[in-house]
Regions:
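Residue-level signature of catalytic and energy-coupling elements of molecular machines
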Residues: 73, 95, 131
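Conserved phosphate-binding/catalytic loops in two-lobed NTP-binding clefts
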Residues: 107-133, 141, 147-148
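Short, small-residue-biased leader/transition segments that mark boundaries at the very start
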Residues: 1-8, 70
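Interdomain boundary/hinge elements
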Residues: 11-15, 87, 121-123, 145-147
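Phosphate-binding glycine-rich/basic clefts of nucleotide- and phosphate-handling proteins
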Residues: 5-63, 78
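Glycine-rich phosphate-binding loops at beta-strand->alpha-helix junctions
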Residues: 25, 85-109
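Phosphate/ATP-binding catalytic cores across multiple sugar-kinase/actin-like superfamilies
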Residues: 61-89, 134-137
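Short flexible coil/turn linkers enriched for glycine and charged/polar residues
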Residues: 30, 45, 87-89, 111-113
Length: 150
């Protein structure tokens, strides 16, 4: 997790790291890239310090995490049954969760996988809404679930 990695240096707090990621972070260069002024602690002197971080610096710091995400998607696609692969090419991949909000992630994932990618209409709530749907419709959907006892 990028926020924890940055915070382990004690330069800034985890909340500040998350705010920076949301403000200027991206998965690829964007036309509206900007800088952010960050207040933290100098690691050498221990004194408060203000630095300016560029979108390119944040993108570089995020790149390992983004690359791992994309590699995981590619691994899943490589073992996807043909009939499901057809469906993916037609309907695409929907990104959910907080990480899906990283600017440029849908575009980069689509570029690297050649599969249409879009952001879920409610990315922060999509997983819990989907789980709720499965619970409400368990009888109709139970054939889709694996038996954990196997």
């Amino acid at each position: 997790d990028w926020s924890s990695d940055v915070c382990s240096s004690d330069l800034i707090g985890e909340r500040t790291a998350e705010e920076i990621k949301m403000q200027i972070g991206s998965a690829m260069p964007m036309t509206n890239d900007r800088d952010a002024e960050v207040r933290g602690r100098d690691l050498v002197t221990g004194l408060p310090k203000t630095v300016v971080l560029t979108a390119a610096e944040i993108r570089e710091a995020l790149d390992d995490v983004v690359t791992r995400m994309i590699d995981s998607v590619k691994e899943c696609l490589a073992v996807t049954p043909p009939e499901l692969a057809q469906d993916l090419l037609t309907r695409g991949i929907y990104l959910v969760g907080g990480g899906a909000l990283l600017r440029g992630l849908p575009e980069r994932l689509q570029y690297e996988t050649k599969v249409p990618v879009q952001l879920s209409p409610q990315p922060l709530e999509a997983v819990v809404l989907g789980a709720g749907h499965c619970i409400e419709n368990y009888q109709a959907l139970r054939g889709m679930f694996m038996d954990a006892r196997r």
